[in-house]
């Protein structure tokens, strides 16, 4: 119940739903109250914020500092384990396997497989539990997609119980102890994930995937015209900012827990 409540409240505070709530409140004031000026202010703030957060220069300027914490892993250090954190998914056996990994999940898996190929004999670990309306776990879907891309099942470990990053860290500790491993997740999520894993006394090596903030050349109109693509980048900023606030409120500093 607490997990569901956390997800609902957290998602309502993300840019799109929050701005729609503000605009909706403004419309309600305009139509059903005498506070016309306040209603106009609410609508104007919501509209302007949505406009700005849907522009590439604004969205990526906000996202880039989070994503640039760790560089892409190109180190020669060899590891025995590569941990790929779960993300959005569904399971429809009629689809191409990779279509079942939604948004951030497929780039994470692709990077995990790249690193697995660079570390012969290593194990790929997929994490993530079962969604409320699904019978297949995030970890299992990741394993099935990896198999479809040529990774032998015996080289894969699935951790099917964790519901969030904190639980994923605890599950990885139980599975591999303090062995060094590559931690693969979205670049925006990696700073927060590293704190949870280090707090467990683990030895994660950061391997970011799914970088979104663009600083390479784009067409001028792509920078100037609002797009849901850029709004999604702003959404990542909101999501990770809320996650870090929650982490701070829980007292997760990144220092190992005292046994």
From Swiss-Prot:
Alphabetically ordered keywords of this record: Cell inner membrane, Cell membrane, Cell wall biogenesis/degradation, Membrane, Transmembrane, Transmembrane helix
Disruption phenotype: Deletion causes a severe growth defect at low temperature and an elevated frequency of cell lysis resulting from impaired metabolism of the essential lipid precursor required for peptidoglycan synthesis.
Record carries keyword Cell inner membrane: yes
GO cellular component, one term: plasma membrane
Bilayer topology: Multi-pass membrane protein
Location (main, coarse): membrane
Keyword Amino-acid biosynthesis attached: no
GO BP, sorted A to Z: cell wall organization; Gram-negative-bacterium-type cell wall biogenesis; peptidoglycan metabolic process; protein folding
Compartment list: Cell inner membrane
Transmembrane segments: 12-32, 39-59
Reported function: Plays a critical role in the metabolism of the essential lipid carrier used for cell wall synthesis.
UniProt xrefs under NCBIfam families: PRK10494.1
Protein name as annotated: Envelope biogenesis factor ElyC
Taxonomic source organism: Escherichia coli (strain K12)
Classification of source organism: Bacteria, Pseudomonadati, Pseudomonadota, Gammaproteobacteria, Enterobacterales
